[in-house]
């Protein structure tokens, strides 16, 4: 008897179907509830139509589930043309009887509406198409257009409810779009659309620091769990990609294998080198040698016949090659041999989510063992702290997932003196932190390096001087005769030898 109750409760659980939209199914913990309706709401240009088309296209191509697309706005020809820009051949699917586009768009010549509004004819057409094509998925774009054509909102709501009820009765999973006036205002323009649907997904395209940032939020998923909050997404060549950072799991393996920094003395300071799956951050003022350490890191990968990829956001390819040559490193040779790939771009050329997707796709294509980003601080310009933090988490999480050693640089705002490396929460995400700084000693400028942090390993705690030579950095002894080096005001420590003998026996209070 107990087993029967358990079996019955399992059957009563809400079943989900995957949408095939990358990252979205993670946010929904498996996909959309089957045989239910989902309202996708957003302002103009947020990607509502793309979402509904991608849902149908992936359902047909990945899960062999035929679909029906009902358009109240655009003509079928326009929809087919727009979908082609994402590589989706809808005409081919139509010819294969796997997709049917039902045209309910208004007459371009206009029409006079007389009598009572009724969707009975349309409901029967949709029901017939579902039976004919054995459709499992339906998309309606958009129900806002229906409200715009008729004044009696309560009547339109009743008819939309009838349509959704019929689709649920048939057993298809429906996605319908609606337009809202403001990204953080009412869910839908007419204030009633959300009440006829089981689930609500909000798409936003918010202006932040003179840039548009797209986010997705699952507001409601009736009868089942989902991830809360806004998640960044981008629209690329393959459609919508959601960055579900909250779905990332700390399940990656941890390696004890060491790799070289490319600088022998720095390896000794790190207890034998970096761990091969670690994230290293070099932070310091401009000109302290951060890019040089990146170059040595890449050179060591080349010497070990390993692939490396460099994303440069502050210098051009020609400038990088010239600077590397001054340290005896030949980037052009590495690229010609297929062991190095350099990608240069202005941070302002696109949004952080697009930069993240480019990094992930390039890593997936090139399959490097080492990744370098020069610099993170350039990408932080003109974006919100939360957006930047999500970007860093996305990059580090993907690097660890792929078991890639990552070397990132960060330019400190202070030219001399102590500086914070925790403002953007970078320090807690990275495994190793190298502090580089200028110090003034006896009227001359010197450079100092310190291994500030290294997870899981002993490391040298001393602050050591280093100089830049034609072969890269040369690390010297520590500033043993000075203290408060990183404060910007170092002063000499008085040794016992400089104290007169008469005072040596006096104990300190």
From Swiss-Prot:
In the UniProt record, the signal sequence range is none
Q: Does the keyword Nucleotide-binding apply?
A: yes
Where, by residue number, does ATP 2 bind?
A: 286-291, 327, 447, 453-455, 457, 459, 461
Q: Which residues in this protein are found as Phosphoserine? A: 427
Q: Which domain of life is it from?
A: Bacteria
What cofactor requirement does the entry state?
A: Mg(2+)
Record CDD domains = KaiC-N (cd19485), KaiC_C (cd19484)
* Residues reported in the UniProt entry to bind Mg(2+) 2: 291, 314
Example of a GO biological process term: regulation of DNA-templated transcription
Catalytic reaction equation(s) = L-seryl-[protein] + ATP = O-phospho-L-seryl-[protein] + ADP + H(+); L-threonyl-[protein] + ATP = O-phospho-L-threonyl-[protein] + ADP + H(+); ATP + H2O = ADP + phosphate + H(+)
Q: Where along the chain is ATP 1 bound?
A: 45-49, 85, 220-222, 224, 226, 237
Q: Can you quote the record's cofactor note?
A: Binds 2 Mg(2+) ions per subunit, one in each domain. Mg(2+) is required for hexamerization and phosphatase activity.
Q: Name one Pfam family in it.
A: ATPase
In which family does this protein belong, per the annotation?
Belongs to the KaiC family.
Q: What does this protein do?
A: Central component of the KaiBC oscillator complex, which constitutes the main circadian regulator in cyanobacteria. Its composition changes during the circadian cycle to control KaiC phosphorylation. Autophosphorylates and has a weak ATPase activity; ATPase activity defines the circadian period.
> NCBIfam families in the record, alphabetically?
circ_KaiC, PRK09302.1
Q: What is this protein called?
A: Circadian clock oscillator protein KaiC
Annotated organism of origin: Prochlorococcus marinus subsp. pastoris (strain CCMP1986 / NIES-2087 / MED4)
Q: Which gene encodes it?
A: kaiC
């Amino acid at each position: 008897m107990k087993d029967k109750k358990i079996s019955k409760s399992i059957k009563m659980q809400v079943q989900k179907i995957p949408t095939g939209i990358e990252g979205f199914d993670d946010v929904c913990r498996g996909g959309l509830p089957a045989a239910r309706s989902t309202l996708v709401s957003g302002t103009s240009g947020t990607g509502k139509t793309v979402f509904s088309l991608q849902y149908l296209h992936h359902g047909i191509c990945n899960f062999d589930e035929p679909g029906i697309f009902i358009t109240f706005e655009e003509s079928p020809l326009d929809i087919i043309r727009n979908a082609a820009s994402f590589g989706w051949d809808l005409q081919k699917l139509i010819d294969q009887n796997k997709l049917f586009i039902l045209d309910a768009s208004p007459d371009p010549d206009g029409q006079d509406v007389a009598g009572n509004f009724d969707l009975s004819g349309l409901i029967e057409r949709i029901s017939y198409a579902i039976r004919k094509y054995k459709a499992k998925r339906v998309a309606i774009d958009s129900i806002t257009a229906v409200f715009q054509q008729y004044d009696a909102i309560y009547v339109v709501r009743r008819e939309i409810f009838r349509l959704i009820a019929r689709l649920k009765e048939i057993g298809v999973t429906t996605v319908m779009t609606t337009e809202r006036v403001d990204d953080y205002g009412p869910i839908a323009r007419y204030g009633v659309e959300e009440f006829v649907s089981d689930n609500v997904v909000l798409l936003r395209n918010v202006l932040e620091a003179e840039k548009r940032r797209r986010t997705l939020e699952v507001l409601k998923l009736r009868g089942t769990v989902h991830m809360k909050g806004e998640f960044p997404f981008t629209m690329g060549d393959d459609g919508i990609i959601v960055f579900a950072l909250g779905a990332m799991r700390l399940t990656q393996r941890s390696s004890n294998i060491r790799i070289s920094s490319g600088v022998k003395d720095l390896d000794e300071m790190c207890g034998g080198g970096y761990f091969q799956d670690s994230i290293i951050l070099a932070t310091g003022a401009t000109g302290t040698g951060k890019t040089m350490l990146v170059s040595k890191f890449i050179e060591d990968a080349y010497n070990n016949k390993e692939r490396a990829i460099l994303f440069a956001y502050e210098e051009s390819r020609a400038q990088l090659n010239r600077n590397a040559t001054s340290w005896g490193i030949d980037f052009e040779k590495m690229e010609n041999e297929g062991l190095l790939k350099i990608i240069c771009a202005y941070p302002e050329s696109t949004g952080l989510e697009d930069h993240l997707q480019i990094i992930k796709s390039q890593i997936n294509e090139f399959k490097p063992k080492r990744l370098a980003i020069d610099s993170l601080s350039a990408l932080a310009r003109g974006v919100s702290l939360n957006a930047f933090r999500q970007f860093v988490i996305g990059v580090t999480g993907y690097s660890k997932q792929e078991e890639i050693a990552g070397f990132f640089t960060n330019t400190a705002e202070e030219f001399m003196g102590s500086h914070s490396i925790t403002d953007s929460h970078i320090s807690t995400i990275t495994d190793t932190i190298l502090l580089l700084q200028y110090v003034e000693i006896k009227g001359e400028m010197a450079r100092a390096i310190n291994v500030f942090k290294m997870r899981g390993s002993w490391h040298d705690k001393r602050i050591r001087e280093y100089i830049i030579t034609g072969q890269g950095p040369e690390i010297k002894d520590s500033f043993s005769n000075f203290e408060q080096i990183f404060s910007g005001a170092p002063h000499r420590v008085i040794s016992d030898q400089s104290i007169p003998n008469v005072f040596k026996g006096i104990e300190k209070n």
